[in-house]
């Protein structure tokens, strides 16, 4: 049985990076706060239940598909079914006709689903007329369900009957045990290695803390067509839940390392009712010491005594987006396409092992399209035409294509309002 979290760790960096965009001051083209003004923001994002993910061929597959395992002779000889079954399959090759003693014990399938949501709380402050500072963090919740099914015809008993007296005691005992292989046996072998809940994992807690600042300036290319630039450096601190090597189905809802990001956006006002622009973000992810179970070879269940501190060298992140914005007065809409990319991770440690298996499929990409509508009463409030200044926004985001990435579809509502401490 493969760890479902190995597949689900594709959520880790991407979820943390996308959630950061909900925070005040980090969303593209929101403008600076006047000096001394405080903005607060609350938001809620609900993700569509995750049952499929994009694989290395940009195809959607069930999350558990990578862990469909056929316990046939080839798989058992490779050692992926455990050392005992590997030894049994090897011995059987030397007894009788190999074509008649090839083990086929059945097929294991996993059906995995993950339900994720995030509530965001943040504050921003106009430190000067040219700079806004912000801080915020999501409160994340996750529920992962994993149903294990073991099916097929187990031929261990028939091989034992065919061998008859040729089978020595140890071989006979091994075949008898192999004939009893079922879900309960597999579950016991996993739990004996110290792994946590197999069928269900639930979490609720703070995500990664985001702090940063933003500045902005305008350049006028020609009369009546200015370009607005916004630049924002930020720091992401690993306060969220990171992948736990002892939990079989957990999701990394935080990065697990410090991330230093920079974002730049440009908007050009084409008409009084229409603007367009680009967004760029690049984050340098710093090395971190983490605990992992290091496989000796290609085994799926890694022994508890293989857990050790390793150096995690995460790949960096970038995002490139293009946006169209339209509307007038209090009501506006936007259409945005974005490419979210996380470069592959590396792990190194003091014990000998297959570190490349830990970082497999960590190079991810997700292309998304989103549509949003907002209501902004700030100018109406300044004209004393509205009682409360606020910005309410509703956003829907849909995946277009992906590489080793979640099939993220989400719906988000955010509300921003303002305080004047003066």
Regions of interest found by a model, annotated:
Residues 29-229, 319, 350-356:
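Transmembrane beta-barrel domains of Gram-negative outer membranes and organellar outer membranes
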Residues 55-77, 157-173, 183-189, 288-422:
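Outer membrane beta-barrel transmembrane domains
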Residues 227-286:
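Loop-centered beta-sheet repeat module
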Residues 121-127, 135, 211-217, 233, ...:
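Residues on the lipid-exposed face of transmembrane beta-strands in outer-membrane beta-barrel proteins
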Residues 38-42, 133-135, 211, 227-233, ...:
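Transmembrane beta-strands of outer-membrane beta-barrel proteins
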Residues 44-50, 137-143, 208, 217, ...:
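Transmembrane beta-strands of outer-membrane beta-barrel pores
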Residues 107-117, 198-207, 243, 254-258, ...:
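Short sequence motifs at beta-strands and strand-loop junctions characteristic
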Residues 27-38, 125-126, 130, 144-146, ...:
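Short loop/turn motifs that connect adjacent beta-strands in outer-membrane beta-barrel proteins
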């Amino acid at each position: 049985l493969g760890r479902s979290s190995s597949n689900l760790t594709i959520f880790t960096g991407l979820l943390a990076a996308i959630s950061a965009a909900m925070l005040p001051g980090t969303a593209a083209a929101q403008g600076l706060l006047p000096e001394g003004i405080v903005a607060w923001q609350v938001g809620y994002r609900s993700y569509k239940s995750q049952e499929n993910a994009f694989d290395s061929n940009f195809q959607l597959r069930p999350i558990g598909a990578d862990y469909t395992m056929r316990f046939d002779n080839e798989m058992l000889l490779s050692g992926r079914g455990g050392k005992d079954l590997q030894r049994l399959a090897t011995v059987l090759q030397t007894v009788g006709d190999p074509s008649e003693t090839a083990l086929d014990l059945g097929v294991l399938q996993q059906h995995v689903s993950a339900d994720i949501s995030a509530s965001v709380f943040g504050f921003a402050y106009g430190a000067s007329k040219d700079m806004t500072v912000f801080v915020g963090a999501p409160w994340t919740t996750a529920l992962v369900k994993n149903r294990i099914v073991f099916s097929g015809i187990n031929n261990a008993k028939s091989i034992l009957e065919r061998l008859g007296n040729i089978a020595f005691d140890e071989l006979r005992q091994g075949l008898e045990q192999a004939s009893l292989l079922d879900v309960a046996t597999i579950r016991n072998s996993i739990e004996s290695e110290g792994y946590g809940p197999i069928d269900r994992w639930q979490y609720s807690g703070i995500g990664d803390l985001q702090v940063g600042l933003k500045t902005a300036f305008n350049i006028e290319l020609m009369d009546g067509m200015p370009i607005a630039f916004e630049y924002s450096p930020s720091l992401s601190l690993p306060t969220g839940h990171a992948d736990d090597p002892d939990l079989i189905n957990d999701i990394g809802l935080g990065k697990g390392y410090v991330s230093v990001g920079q974002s730049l956006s440009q908007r050009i006002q084409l008409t009084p009712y229409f603007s367009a622009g680009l967004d760029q973000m690049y984050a340098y992810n710093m090395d971190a010491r983490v605990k992992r179970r290091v496989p000796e070879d290609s085994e799926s269940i890694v022994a508890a005594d293989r857990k050790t501190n390793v150096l995690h060298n995460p790949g960096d992140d970038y995002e490139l987006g293009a946006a169209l914005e339209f509307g007038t007065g209090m009501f506006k809409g936007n259409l945005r396409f974005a490419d979210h990319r996380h470069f592959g991770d590396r792990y190194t440690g003091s014990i000998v092992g297959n570190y490349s298996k830990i970082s497999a499929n960590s190079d991810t990409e997700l292309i998304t399209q989103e549509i949003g509508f907002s209501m902004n009463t700030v100018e109406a409030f300044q004209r004393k035409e509205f009682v409360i200044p606020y910005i309410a926004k509703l956003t829907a985001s849909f995946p277009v294509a992906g590489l080793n990435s979640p099939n993220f579809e989400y719906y988000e509502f955010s509300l921003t309002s303002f305080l004047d401490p003066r």
